[in-house]
Design a protein with these regions (language model features):
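Hydrophobic membrane-insertion alpha-helices, especially the h-region
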Residues: 8-19
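N-terminal, polar/Ser/Thr-rich
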Residues: 21-82
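Short, solvent-exposed beta-strand/turn "edge" segments of beta-rich domains on protein surfaces
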Residues: 75-86, 92-96, 168-173, 459-461
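Asparagine-centered strand-capping/turn motif at beta-strand->loop junctions
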Residues: 93-99, 107-109
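An acidic, Ser/Thr-enriched
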Residues: 108, 117-161, 165-271, 292, ...
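Extracytoplasmic/secreted cell-surface and envelope-processing proteins
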Residues: 187-189, 278-281, 310-315, 367-377, ...
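Von Willebrand factor
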Residues: 262-317, 341-344, 348, 355-363, ...
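VWA/integrin I-like adhesion module and closely mimicked acidic/polar interface patches used
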Residues: 365-414, 420, 425, 431-432
Length: 564
């Protein structure tokens, strides 16, 4: 079957607002938003050793003819509170041509990001986006576009990619956008603002406010600057969780099994995603695969590349892959559609004499062809038990990832649980982790909680951070978290309700997607949560129109048509 080239667009964003402002109202000008500044100001330089080099710009606005508009200014404000960070990004793009243009704004956010605001400046006024069911929003956008008015539409794409259709971009003028989001920073994870890969920026101004107990503001100001790396702040304090009324977001580190013996790695099938969604950073991905296999030593491996089809790349000892298979993998090139179903089907074709015990899947989890439902893909993986498969591990590659889908594959359809590990950890560390046992589906409980997410620990190894969300009865103080046989009482700090509430809503939407038996009901509930708590979901968009009357007329009509 001929491999069809697919064009995939992908971009990045990072940053946010400080202090007590966590919930914005429509029609509020950005100039009116107060940004509190903590006492004690220090300068922090760019990170000199990011874990993984990025190819391509993290933020872009591309015109309909494919040409990029110049990013002339970035102003970023971030507030870090324990395991949560809140970021506001103010971006200014410039149209060098003497004609009005329509463009696509794209950005790749952290995997846990919850978008809460998207605004576009029209004239001297900031027009705020409203959360609308996705199809209804598209109908409204097209209607206003044809009327030569000024709409914008922000949607969540594959994984953690967000894109916005923007019109108009004035001739020889500027288009200003604001985007805000919250994200989870587990345990010792640093706050990272993606800048690496951006072209020269006329003005860059970044401020990151760290926890209130330390009251510090980290600042970076540059003119005519081309970032070589991301901006990273590790100064997070000792808070392990946040509370707001009856809601909790906490981080714990289970250590059960830390002294257990290493688990031998048996014959392993290595599935490497070579679809078009992996085009950015494909060379780095191939090198990471080679490094991982080198560190697996004499383990027999069968390496297969897949997109919407599959092709054998190498069979032999893991340590021999660099000499015997790396060049062939590079020559495969990332061109096709993304089909995890095709990859799993390829495992069935391997001779039983190989004695397959392990599966190592290198992918971003993005699916553009074939089965995409995580639970159905897990069932296909479970069917491979009859061929002797015992454990599946996943190396999550690239900045755009479908984490929920990948979690479903490592969650336990096989006799032994596997891990979901970031490709940025590097081949040596990944290979070592593959030989370590996994805390298999340990039950998670929060004493007295009405609701807990996740309900089981997935792909967790001793010492890994685990973020737990919970809703407790009102007026309950303290939080006791149990993971398997271990109990934790994390140190909590009070946080603004709107910040914690949005994290809770995002987790609630993920819980519905993972566990609801009624897909239509889960979607309806997710849309309501998205609109009520201002959290973008796969089922909603942020639609910018010119006036309240426009929302009432166009959106109400479109929503009625789609019975939302």
């Amino acid at each position: 079957m001929k491999r069809t080239p697919f064009l995939v667009t992908c971009v990045v964003v990072p940053s946010l607002i400080g202090g007590g402002l966590y919930l914005e109202h429509r029609r509020r000008a950005a100039a009116d938003v107060p940004i509190p500044v903590a006492d004690g100001r220090i300068d922090v330089e760019l990170d000199q050793a990011p874990p993984q080099k990025r190819t391509g710009a993290p933020i872009s606005l591309t015109a309909s003819d494919g040409s990029g508009l110049k990013l002339v200014s970035i102003r970023a404000e971030a507030q870090v509170e324990g395991p949560l960070a809140f970021t506001e990004l103010h971006l200014v793009f410039e149209n060098p041509e003497s004609r009005v243009r329509e463009g696509t704004f794209t950005i790749d956010l952290p995997a846990s990001a919850e978008v809460s605001r998207f605004a576009m400046k029209i004239g001297s006024t900031w027009q705020e986006g409203e959360f609308v069911e996705k199809q209804a929003a598209r109908v409204a956008y097209e209607d206003f576009l044809h009327r030569k008015q000024d709409p914008a539409l922000l949607e969540q794409g594959p994984g953690n990619t967000f894109s916005a259709r923007v019109f108009p971009i004035p001739p020889r003028g500027r288009k200003e956008l604001i985007l805000t989001y919250s994200e989870i920073l587990p345990a010792s994870a640093a706050y990272r603002l993606p800048l690496q890969g951006l072209p020269e920026i006329g003005s860059l101004n970044v401020r990151v406010h760290t926890p209130r107990g330390q009251a510090r503001t980290h600042e970076l100001v540059r003119k005519n600057f081309s970032p070589a790396d991301d901006y990273v702040i590790a100064d997070k304090g000792v808070v392990e969780g946040l509370s707001a009324a009856d809601l909790r977001v906490v981080t714990v580190r289970p250590t059960a099994g830390a002294g257990a013996a290493e688990e031998p790695i048996g014959p392993t099938v290595v599935l490497v995603d070579t679809s078009a969604s992996r085009s950015a950073g494909f060379a780095e991905q191939a090198e990471m695969v080679a490094q991982t296999l080198e560190n697996m030593g004499d383990v027999p491996v069968h390496v297969i590349a897949f997109d919407q089809t599959s092709a054998p790349i190498y069979t032999g000892s893991a340590k021999g892959f660099r000499a015997g298979g790396l060049e062939k993998l590079r020559d495969r090139k990332p061109l096709g559609a993304s089909s995890l179903e095709a990859g799993l089907a390829a495992v069935e074709g391997i001779d039983k004499g190989f004695g397959t015990k392990r599966l190592l899947l290198v992918t971003d989890g993005v699916v553009t062809y074939g089965e995409s439902d995580g639970r159905k893909l897990a069932s296909k993986l479970e069917a491979l038990r009859s061929r002797g498969l015992e454990r599946a591990d996943i190396i999550a590659a690239g900045g755009i990832r479908e984490k929920e889908r990948l979690d479903a594959l490592v969650a336990g359809p096989l006799p032994k649980a596997g891990i979901l590990v970031d490709a940025a950890e590097g081949g040596k560390r990944i290979a070592k982790r593959l030989s370590k046992p996994v805390l298999a589906n340990a039950e998670i409980d929060v004493a007295g909680a009405i609701w807990v997410y996740p309900k089981k620990a997935i792909g967790l190894q001793p010492g890994d951070p685990l973020v737990v969300y919970a809703q407790l009865p009102k007026n309950v103080s303290g939080t006791k978290v149990t993971v398997g046989t271990q109990t934790f009482e994390p140190k909590l700090a009070e946080a603004p309700m709107e910040l914690v509430e949005r994290a809770w809503a995002k987790a609630k939407i993920a819980d519905l997607a993972a566990h609801s038996e009624d897909a239509a009901d889960a979607k309806a509930q997710a849309i309501e949560l998205s609109k009520r708590y201002r959290v973008l979901s796969p089922y909603t968009s942020l639609l910018v129109l010119e006036s309240d009357a426009d929302y009432e007329r166009i959106v109400a009509r479109a929503q009625a048509a789609f019975k939302v």
